[in-house]
Amino acid sequence: MKLIFEKSIPGRGQDIFPACDVPCKLPDAPLREKKAHLPEISENEMGRHYTALAKRAHGVNDGFYPLGSCTMKHNPRINEKMASLPGFTKLHPLQPAHTVEGANELIADLERFLCEITGMAGVTFQPAAGAHGEFTGLLLIKAYHHDRGDFERNEIIVPDAAHGTNPASATMAGYKTIVIKSNENGTVDIDDLKAHLGPKTAGLMLTNPNTVGLFDPNIMEITRLVHEAGGLCYYDGANLNAVIGIVRPADIGFDVIHMNLHKTFSTPHGGGGPGSGPCAYKDFLAPFAPGLVCKDGEYTRAEKSIGNMTGFYGNFLVMVKAYTYLLTIGKEVYTLAQNAVLNANYMQEKLKDIYPIAFDTTCMHEFVIGLDPIYRKTHVSALDVAKALLDYGIHPPTIYFPLIVHEALMIEPTETETKETLDEAIQAFREIYDRIFNAPESVQNAPQTTPVLRLDDTKAARDPHLRYTFE
């Protein structure tokens, strides 16, 4: 398939603006020395080009998308319809408060909903993504300790099964990351946690349920120990879909949390955004909240605010979509978690007789296959199985994560998939298993039916071509 630059023909493009009859000359300094390399192509050819590209990709509208820890659920179209209402799309963030009262009311209502779901006292919608929400929460923790004169607390504890953004966010916030072990059951090793708690502990970052799909049975003890050591507890809300409406993070000892509107609350993934990672916090952290807060038509800033995390209010239209979703679901929001957990356990039970499950117990919203025993016998890897699934019209699960499971396949079906879809996926996994032992090369050479076949990973790493070269 040709690149759009290769389809470009000089002169085929058309100026957007008509010629101006007012003489004008810009200073030379801001002008380009050479013409920009922009493709010149007709509108219908451009439409065909990107439609063809879309057909070469796989999204939630194309088929099953069990990407673990990503909650690739259906994005209801009513969300898009509401977010496209002119009353929302034509707003400008610099408008006077009295002209955007409807938008402010929506933000206030959504904050109230999320506080009810999490048990927290307040929410900032400024963070534009999950990791951005983590960073915001850690800055709140840091501001809290510094306000108390507790400058020695410079360590954030994370488990070895944590999302990679956790230590990255801690580093960005100026903390040293302390990694603790998981126990044989896949949850936090309490003894290792105790050994690393101390006067330098600023907090603990924890996903619960964690990345192997298990809810930590010792969570109350874990948060108590951190608090007794003087630290705060941060809840990574990436897996909130497993417990929404059933467990409130604040009730199990957490002080601050980020949520992914583009996961749990059904707003779209992909395309580089926009995402939204609102950060909720308990009342004692409210004095440090970022951005401006609108109450009764007046904008105020928290007295000890950490400042702005982004411009204005955050990604407002994403909030509209999440708000629509929650109004649609209503008080039965707990059914999301129930069905997500049911679907994951159904798949796990149907596959555990042939695939080694990393932690063979009732899971939450996702489960992890540890393919290492099979790989040692056949040299068919988790990557090979993931590639083979593409030939069945299934997006691969997350692979090689969490790091505590060798040859990991992390599978999250979400609550929006039907039993028929799950059964088709289960059958695909079982057929691939048979091929692993009877025709391993067919799996190792997969996929065979996709527009792009298996790449030469070694060549791509050693001789990358990352940009189009113009003559």
Spans of features found by a protein language model:
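Long, K/E/R/D-enriched contiguous segments that form extended
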Residues: 108-112, 118-121, 126-137, 141
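General small-molecule cofactor/ligand-binding pocket signal
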Residues: 124, 178-180, 397
